[in-house]
């Protein structure tokens, strides 16, 4: 029945999704501030069309929130569905094979910024709700909360949740913003890493200076920054900030056995991103490195002359954006201060260092014995034909731990992305097969949840 419904309504569904994608709701870029409001308003319209009884765009300290609800019985359980309508910047545009904000279907995939993260996945939730609502299959209440700042760390959502605790009161939270290991390896995410993110600025002379007149006589800020970053890890991939690992727990033998049982194709993994060799902390497998271990990365670095031809200068300033993915028990605020203090302490006196903490969030672990998890597990199994693996994956959704702290409920991470979907990258996409299966699996979740 659900397959037939999707087939008969897919053209309309895609038109609705594409109306969201065409709004360039890039939260990181101030120029797109009006687009955030436009996208929120469009989501409100789509939720009403899907069957909620109430939907509104609500103000926050930042970009607007979208709230919707379908209350079938005040004494029944309530599922809160969370998603985000903001997307990552699409740059570099020249690497896209089609316009990032003009969705295109080719080779069985939807190609666009937000096709997966998270417009596509949130839309899966909305269409699954549409089916159960319009067919009078719901026995529990459903609420939606969609934010517009997830890609910049959800700075406004915590205060919004605190202010609207009663409105958002629920028994469990359902999120589609994660990935499966493969379409033939159904997966439910049971853990997320936390994150801490900084921008570092290294200043030398008070202006860009002639590299012949000053080269060898003063410190070059770019050289210094590169050395500071290089010295933060060793050749075995271990992070060298003192105290960084103090609260990191080793994975249990059972957890390591579970990860080892996941059939990850390492050659295919390398081929998909065109690298010849993998690298990471010595003594751990690839899935252990991304699931159970913290990491340190440079997300951007710039300074000096980068135009055509040559310009012989020593730059006044050099910059980098840095991030650490964290594991449960590592506090992002503590790590934020620890890393900031480290760089200021070890920097040579020949330069000035300013480091700003931009955003962060805690990690999260979902207990796999909770009834709602079992409903999700069954919902996925009914569609994909096999029981989904329980796996901790390397990404971060900082607000998940905040939901638990304020609302006191757990979150089920029921994602339908794939690594090949290239989220945060040029040519982001979503297979139509996963779009369809996702809707069907979430419908099954709701039906199974009602049996609890």
Predicted regions and their residues:
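Polar, glycine-rich mid-to-C-terminal structural blocks
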Residues: 205-208, 212, 217-269
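Active-site metal-coordination/substrate-binding segment of hydrolases
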Residues: 76-143, 437
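Acidic/histidine-rich catalytic neighborhood of metal-dependent amide-processing enzymes
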Residues: 116-191
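Acidic, glycine-rich active-site loops and adjacent beta-strand->loop/helix elements
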Residues: 85-87, 145-153, 176-180, 204-206, ...
